[in-house]
């Protein structure tokens, strides 16, 4: 049938952060078992990751942390932490010197004596997305409302609490989330490959997105 196109763009999103000590239910479910298992000592890489992701510094800042053991027999007890500090609910930033210092001091109290911990800057892999929504014509008068709903879904998907180091972006997962809205017939991301792979020290972050509407 005949199609009508409209475009909509949201750039440089800034979202107010939540309470500084408000650990999310998802964080508690994911990292709680590791903390319990470690008996308040940092023994395994999972312990370091759990501790780092639940850590708040002296200024109330939190962030995302991953840990790896440096390769090579002679350095088996060197733990490399990769850290990013939370700027907003959907944005990470390079961790401040204060944040790194506070994290390292807290770790020193709980780590094994034979472990040497090195704090490194994590890397943000930003995405710019061009998205096409296919809607039935009868929804044309509700276009702005639908765009707002879809935008909320997108921002929720990319919330810092949902992102992890070494977690690839799978296009189909976001398309599926947008498709959950009853008004959306189809949703496609048009400008990136099906999988955006990241390294162990990288984390995905949304930079901006545009919504194109195609009426069926």
PLM region spans:
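Immediate N-terminus of the mature polypeptide
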Residues: 2-7, 17-25, 122, 160, ...
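Short capping/connector residues at structural and topological boundaries
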Residues: 41, 48, 174, 189, ...
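Generic beta-strand hydrophobic packing signal
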Residues: 13, 65, 187-192, 209
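Catalytic P-loop NTP-binding/switch module of NTPases
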Residues: 1-50
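Short loop/turn elements at secondary-structure junctions
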Residues: 58-60, 73, 176-202
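Preference for short coil/turn "hinge" residues that link or interrupt alpha-helices
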Residues: 29, 36, 158, 162, ...
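Carbohydrate-recognition loop of C-type lectin domains
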Residues: 39-167, 174
């Amino acid at each position: 049938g005949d199609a009508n196109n409209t475009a909509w763009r949201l750039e440089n999103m800034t979202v107010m952060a939540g309470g500084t000590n408000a650990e999310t239910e998802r964080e508690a479910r994911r990292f709680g078992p590791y903390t319990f298992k470690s008996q308040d000592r940092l023994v395994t890489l999972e312990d370091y990751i759990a501790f780092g992701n639940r850590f708040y510094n002296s200024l109330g800042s939190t962030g995302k942390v991953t840990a790896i053991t440096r390769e090579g027999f002679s350095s088996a007890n060197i733990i490399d932490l990769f850290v990013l500090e939370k700027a907003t609910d959907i944005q990470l930033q390079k961790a401040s010197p204060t944040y790194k210092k506070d994290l390292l001091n807290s770790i020193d109290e709980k780590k094994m004596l034979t472990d040497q911990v090195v704090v490194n800057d994590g890397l943000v892999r930003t995405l710019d997305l061009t998205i096409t929504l296919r809607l039935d014509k009868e929804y044309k008068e509700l276009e702005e409302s639908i765009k707002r709903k879809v935008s909320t879904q997108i921002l929720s998907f990319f919330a810092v609490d949902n992102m992890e180091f070494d977690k690839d972006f799978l296009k189909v997962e976001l398309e599926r989330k947008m498709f959950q809205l009853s008004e959306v017939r189809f949703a496609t991301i048009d400008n990136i490959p099906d999988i955006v792979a990241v390294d162990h020290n990288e984390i995905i972050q949304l930079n901006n997105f545009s919504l194109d509407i195609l009426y069926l």
